[in-house]
């Protein structure tokens, strides 16, 4: 089932949606004008047939750029980077990245508020957004790419074997003799359970017990991205696998198991993880190939609810824990902060939190984050006992991110406080309110890549 990422960009315009029921994106048309991107149009493939989508926007004076995706060669779009003008809300520039390359920057100007549409290990199968005379916003549908099988390389001796396709790999055991790789054993993950498969011969062609060498993967936080294999003839016989080494998503490289030879093959597929092995073997590993599939999705990091700061009045509220914070609304009143509400992200979906406190005629001030690259690291503020209040109220709030600091909302007075934890980011808020904001606290999670 496709996962929908909400559209990024300015407000307004007419909503449009190409849908998600395509196998791939095959061509992208972008027309730029003086105010930014005028229109965008996509071509897709569905059930093996080309589907030409409608124009989203209006064609005026300008120029059109196109980007073709070679889907027949396994190429697919994995992410979109763009920016939009804060005043007009018009998208100014777009750049599309596939599993093989990046497009040129399409449009006039790459300044403004930047955004990214991406779900790691997934491909884009459809787009949606809004437009009027120009393109105002752009969102996308993502699906996991189908597994691919890369044919084995090496010799033709022995019999074929195939471990099949799994969720991921936890550990690899490689046994080698002085002349070749003799045995491979893999601990695979299959929906949270370990399944072990092995092929080859521990004694090898020399009939001497070999010592298995282990390479442990920190699954599901790490996965194997590529295998380097060398092959050569052994004692005038058929080609056999002489050495192996592995690279992971954490930029780790295993030791080289065996002795490297001249003929080198690298199995990899950008944006995918190694999920299975196949090849040929008898007394040794004669040939080796690979299956690549979607990378594992690690579980969310553990969260910690930090004690709030402020007074004890009002009723308790707790938004819970999310993947991150996208936007903050702060409403001020006569005595201090009258109300707050937050927009969160959960599984790449917007979640609008409830209003905490009482909305005033002054309305809300907004602080929007460049999510997911930007996140809140700390909240600073003041609380004070004010006339007519049953307890101390929050009179000022300021939000620090990994990139910048928000303006102060309210006035510095009373007791200062800082909410946060080293190496963590804010993923939720809690506190006490009604009719004013009396207390605020945060829920944090470890910062991960």
From Swiss-Prot:
Annotated InterPro entries: Jacalin-like_lectin_dom (IPR001229), Jacalin-like_lectin_dom_plant (IPR033734), Jacalin-like_lectin_dom_sf (IPR036404)
Q: Does the keyword Acetylation apply?
A: yes
What keywords would UniProt list here?
Acetylation, Lectin, Repeat
Q: Which domain of life is it from?
A: Eukaryota
Annotated region Disordered: the residues are 1-20, 294-314
> Which stretch is the leader sequence?
none
Is-annotated flag, keyword Cytoplasm? no
**Any Pfam family:** Jacalin
> What Gene Ontology terms describe where this protein resides (cellular component)?
plasmodesma
Start and end residues of each Jacalin-type lectin domain: 2-144, 147-294, 303-446
Q: Which residues carry this modification: N-acetylalanine?
A: 2
Show the PROSITE patterns listed in the entry.
JACALIN_LECTIN
- A Gene Ontology MF term for this entry? carbohydrate binding
Family affiliation: Belongs to the jacalin lectin family.
What is the protein's given name? Jacalin-related lectin 20
Taxonomic source organism: Arabidopsis thaliana (Mouse-ear cress)
């Amino acid at each position: 089932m496709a996962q929908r990422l909400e559209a990024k960009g300015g407000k307004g315009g007419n909503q449009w949606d190409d849908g998600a029921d395509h196998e791939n994106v095959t061509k992208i048309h972008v027309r730029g004008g003086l105010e930014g991107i005028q229109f965008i149009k996509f071509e897709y493939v569905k059930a093996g047939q080309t589907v030409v989508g409608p124009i989203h926007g209006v064609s005026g004076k300008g120029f059109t750029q196109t980007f073709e995706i070679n889907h027949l060669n396994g190429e697919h779009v994995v992410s979109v980077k763009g920016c939009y003008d804060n005043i007009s809300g018009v998208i100014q520039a777009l750049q599309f990245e596939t599993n093989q390359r990046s497009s040129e920057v399409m449009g006039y100007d790459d300044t403004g508020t930047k955004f990214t549409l991406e779900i790691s290990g997934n491909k884009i199968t459809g787009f949606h957004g809004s437009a009027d005379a120009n393109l105002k916003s752009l969102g996308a549908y993502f699906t996991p790419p189908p597994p691919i099988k890369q044919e084995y390389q090496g010799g033709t001796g022995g019999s074929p074997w195939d471990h099949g396709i799994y969720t991921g790999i936890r550990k690899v055991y490689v046994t080698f003799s002085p002349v070749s790789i003799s045995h491979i054993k893999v601990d695979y993950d299959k929906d949270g359970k370990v399944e072990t498969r092995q092929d080859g011969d521990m004694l090898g062609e020399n009939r001497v017990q070999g010592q298995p060498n282990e390479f442990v993967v920190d699954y599901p936080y790490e996965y194997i991205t590529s295998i380097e294999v060398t092959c050569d003839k052994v004692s005038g016989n058929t080609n056999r696998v002489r050495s192996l080494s592995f690279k992971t998503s954490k930029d780790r490289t295993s030791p080289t198991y065996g002795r490297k030879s001249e003929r080198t093959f690298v199995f990899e597929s950008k944006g995918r993880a190694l999920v299975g092995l196949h090849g040929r073997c008898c007394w040794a590993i004669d040939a080796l190939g690979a299956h690549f599939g979607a990378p594992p999705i690690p579980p969310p990091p553990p969260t910690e609810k930090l004690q709030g700061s402020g007074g004890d009045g009002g009723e308790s509220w707790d938004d819970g824990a999310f993947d991150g914070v996208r936007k903050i609304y702060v409403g001020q009143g006569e005595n201090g902060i009258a109300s707050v509400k937050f927009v969160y992200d959960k599984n790449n979906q917007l979640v609008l939190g409830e209003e905490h406190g009482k909305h005033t005629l002054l309305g809300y001030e907004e602080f929007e984050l460049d999510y997911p690259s930007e996140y809140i690291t700390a909240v600073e503020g003041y609380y004070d006992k004010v006339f007519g209040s049953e307890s101390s109220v929050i009179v000022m709030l300021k939000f620090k991110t990994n990139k910048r600091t928000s303006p102060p909302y309210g006035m510095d007075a009373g007791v200062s406080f800082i909410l946060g934890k080293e190496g963590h980011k804010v993923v939720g808020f809690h506190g006490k309110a009604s009719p004013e904001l009396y207390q605020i606290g945060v829920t944090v999670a470890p910062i991960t890549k």
